[in-house]
UniProtKB/Swiss-Prot annotation:
EC assignment: 3.1.1.29
Signal peptide start-end: none
PANTHER family linked: PEPTIDYL-TRNA HYDROLASE 2, PEPTIDYL-TRNA HYDROLASE 2, MITOCHONDRIAL
InterPro entries, alphabetized: Pep_tRNA_hydro_II_dom_sf, Pept_tRNA_hydro_arch, PTH2
Compartments reported by the entry: Cytoplasm
Protein name: Peptidyl-tRNA hydrolase
Pfam families: PTH2 (PF01981)
Reactions catalysed: an N-acyl-L-alpha-aminoacyl-tRNA + H2O = an N-acyl-L-amino acid + a tRNA + H(+)
Predominant cellular place of this UniProt entry's protein: cytoplasm
Family matches, as HAMAP family: Pept_tRNA_hydro_arch
Annotated source species: Haloarcula marismortui (strain ATCC 43049 / DSM 3752 / JCM 8966 / VKM B-1809)
SUPFAM superfamilies from the UniProt entry: Peptidyl-tRNA hydrolase II
GO terms assigned for molecular function: peptidyl-tRNA hydrolase activity
Keyword Cytoplasm: yes
Gene: pth
Length: 112
């Protein structure tokens, strides 16, 4: 079981902003999962990986694949209180789900 969080590398988020957006995505996708995958993921150590995307359109393409695969996922839009304009799409989380299912969506992306 794992979760992949894909963050945009093209919008110049500071380290703190990046950490917050990754956390928002992780929690939102966790909430999108059913009780069985949530329990299994928590019991297996809550494995996560943070990956890079190069554009908003890439995040939406990945989200579409996750949707078609029936995987829990969440797209994060920033509130715009600090570094980014309101509504800026910053991250996508896929999972928690079986590793191979998450890899169908995010397996070709580089580490952040």
């Amino acid at each position: 079981m794992k979760q992949a969080i894909v963050a945009r590398a093209d919008i110049g988020m500071g380290e703190g902003k990046l950490a917050a957006q990754v956390a928002h995505a992780s929690l939102s996708a966790y909430e999108d999962a059913g009780p069985k995958p949530r329990k299994a993921w928590k019991g297996a150590g809550q494995k996560k990986v943070v990956l890079k995307a190069t554009s908003e359109s890439e995040l939406f393409e990945l989200a579409d694949v996750a949707e078609r695969e029936g995987l829990p996922h969440a797209v994060v839009r920033d509130a715009g209180h600090t570094q980014l304009d309101p509504g800026t799409v910053t991250a996508l989380a896929v999972g928690p789900a079986e590793d191979e299912l998450v890899d169908r969506v995010t397996g070709d992306l580089p580490l952040f």
